[in-house]
């Protein structure tokens, strides 16, 4: 059984701050899936800051609960049209997101943490997105198809 307890529109720090109540009690047969960083990049937070925070937190979490880290997909130009970012920031933001994804993948491998690379598995086509960043109904179905094989512990 899957139970979604997500935070949409949150930054990484918000996501990690919300975990304290969750981690205060034991959870059997639970896999914690976490994907974040895109909102931080869109807000202008430096990738090096995200990487330090993520590495510190996943090191702690990995000792408490089985993890699966989602590597975010890149953004499409629709995100400019819908107002999420400016045209001049689009290329830089996608480059930062790609570098952040490479960092996550390398560290998940080093730490033996399960990961799903949505940046390569998810189609980079506006047909799958509602706004160039967030999936639409068809996109969420595709996310679920990609993630399902990883969600058993």
List each language-model region with its residue ranges.
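Histidine-bearing beta->alpha loop at or near hydrolase active sites
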Residues: 7-10
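Alpha-helical cap/lid subdomain in secreted, periplasmic
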Residues: 16-153
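Short, small-residue-biased leader/transition segments that mark boundaries at the very start
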Residues: 1-2
């Amino acid at each position: 059984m899957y139970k979604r307890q997500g935070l949409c529109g949150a930054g990484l720090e918000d996501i990690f701050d919300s975990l304290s109540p969750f981690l205060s009690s034991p959870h059997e047969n639970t896999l914690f899936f976490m994907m974040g960083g895109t909102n931080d990049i869109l807000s202008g937070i430096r990738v090096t800051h995200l990487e330090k925070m993520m590495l510190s937190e996943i090191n702690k979490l990995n000792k408490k609960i089985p993890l699966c880290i989602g590597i975010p997909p890149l953004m499409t130009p629709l995100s400019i049209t819908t107002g999420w970012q400016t045209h001049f920031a689009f290329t830089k933001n996608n480059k930062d997101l790609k570098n952040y994804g490479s960092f996550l993948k390398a560290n998940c491998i080093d730490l033996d943490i399960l990961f799903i690379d949505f940046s390569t598995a998810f189609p980079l086509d506006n047909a799958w997105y509602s706004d160039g960043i967030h999936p639409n109904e068809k996109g969420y179905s595709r996310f679920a198809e990609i993630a399902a094989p990883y969600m058993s512990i």
